[in-house]
Amino acid sequence: MGRGVECALASSKDMELVGVFTRRDPASLKTLTGAKVFSMEDAEKMTQDIDVMILCGGSANDLPKQTVDMAKLYNVVDSFDTHAKIPQHFAAVDTSAKENGKIAVISAGWDPGMFSLNRLYGQAVLPNGHDYTFWGKGVSQGHSDAIRRIEGVQDARQYTIPVEAALESVRRGEDPELTTRQKHIRECFVVAKEGADRNVIKEAIVTMPNYFADYDTTVHFISQEELDRDHAGIPHGGIVFRTGTTGLNNEHRHLIEYKLTLDSNPEFTSSVLVAFARAAYRMNKEGMSGCKTVFDIAPAYLHPESGDVLRATLL
């Protein structure tokens, strides 16, 4: 995702990449644009040079500590995506940011992030209705990693795919009650190590709790060459629906559909982070501090143009 942020900043004329901070040896990291590379230990020495720090670490082990620590020094943006733990992450980051007069935007990305906003708008506009969120078709990196941890597996990719019948039922306004299995299927492409028992691997995948057991799961065994050739990208996407009714007798039906089709999941997420970095800087310049989510940030803060231009051209 760091590479994605580097690319997104190159397309943002009002922003400048001061440097990339790494826990590795800075000399070992080659950037795409020739940006300077610093050790993470240097971060606290550069507070006068940097307006916003964009955090590209993982939600499981990096961001719970990193966002809190960095918000003591900088305005920050992260893409924390463990939905169930967002309230506790918010509370910890809010304390740190407020105590140090900084803005910290958490959980920016597309889900949480852009999808969250569309769920909120849908519920606000159509209070009598139902939400539906579908993910894919796309590579789930967490599920792919789970397969790779199975004994006998050399490499793997897992795709999350919406069930077409479920999508069409929602679009027809049938307001279906959908189980996990009825919403998505999982398709796995697996490279088995030489001599590994494929039946044992397949059984371990399809019965894996929290990952595959609740889904209809298909497993394909292919060669490493085929995997590298046909499944090297990280596409993703999804759809947020809000169905609802209006009128005294709920006689009129409505459907809101917001869809993403992404060639590169990390690059799109990075582009969202950069837009919210702009907002964090602007809000802090106005004297605001504390933790913010996409729900708390006015859209005009995200766009490089002024309010006058936005009102004249987009409104």
Which residues fall in each region the model found?
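C-terminal substrate-binding/catalytic lobe of Rossmann-fold NAD(P)-dependent oxidoreductases
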Residues: R3-G4, S11-A43, V139-A277
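Rossmann-fold NAD(P) dinucleotide-binding segment
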Residues: A43-V52, A60-S79
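General beta-strand structural signal in soluble alpha/beta enzymes
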Residues: D78-S79, A104-A108, F134, R157-Q158
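Oxidoreductase and adenylate-handling cofactor-binding alpha/beta cores
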Residues: M114-H130, D145-D155, A279
